[in-house]
């Protein structure tokens, strides 16, 4: 699996992964449906968003792995769906789902968040069962489809978002001689 090889090679910098973030950002802003040749970036971003330890961190036992690694939880729920959270009583089911919908459901369970916006940005289309399962979780408010290694390293080192303290002001004027022009 390419995810594990990138995990072994990545050094918490954007230039140490085997895909280009520019290509990932192009995909998540394109509105296109369907898979991407940069899908490794999608899996990697889930790791970046939900795993707090550094890439080289090892854990003493499977319980610690499940607690700290999203793909350990995804694997656990794929093997035993009865372990998956169901806060509003909607149980996880994988029956009849295609591979994309299985992944979306498992990721929602593992993150305990509705992460469908993330997958939609990556071109996946959730079915009705996936939407119903995901809707019982709070929506992921972070734009995790923009996360990169350096942002995660910043978070791991105790950094926090400055978004709440930043104010942005802009002024626009319509050109009187050319109404289609705004400056």
Where are these predicted regions, by residue range?
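Zinc-dependent metallopeptidase catalytic helix centered on the HExxH motif
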Residues: 1-30
């Amino acid at each position: 699996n390419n995810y594990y090889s990138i995990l072994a090679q990545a050094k918490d910098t954007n230039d140490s992964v085997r895909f280009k973030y520019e290509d990932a950002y192009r995909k998540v802003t394109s509105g296109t449906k369907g898979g991407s040749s940069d899908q490794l970036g999608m899996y990697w971003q889930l790791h970046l968003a939900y795993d707090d330890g550094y890439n080289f961190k090892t854990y003493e036992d499977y319980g610690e792995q499940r607690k700290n690694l999203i793909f350990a939880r995804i694997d656990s729920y794929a093997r035993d769906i009865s372990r998956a959270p169901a806060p509003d009583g909607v149980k996880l089911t994988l029956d009849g789902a295609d591979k994309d919908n299985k992944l979306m459901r498992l990721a929602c369970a593992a993150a305990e968040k509705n992460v469908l916006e993330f997958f939609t940005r990556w071109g996946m289309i959730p079915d009705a069962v996936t939407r119903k399962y995901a809707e019982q979780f709070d929506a992921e408010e972070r734009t995790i489809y923009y996360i990169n290694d350096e942002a995660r390293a910043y978070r791991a080192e105790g950094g926090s978002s400055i978004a709440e303290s930043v104010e942005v002001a802009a002024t626009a004027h319509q050109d009187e001689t050319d109404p289609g022009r705004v400056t």
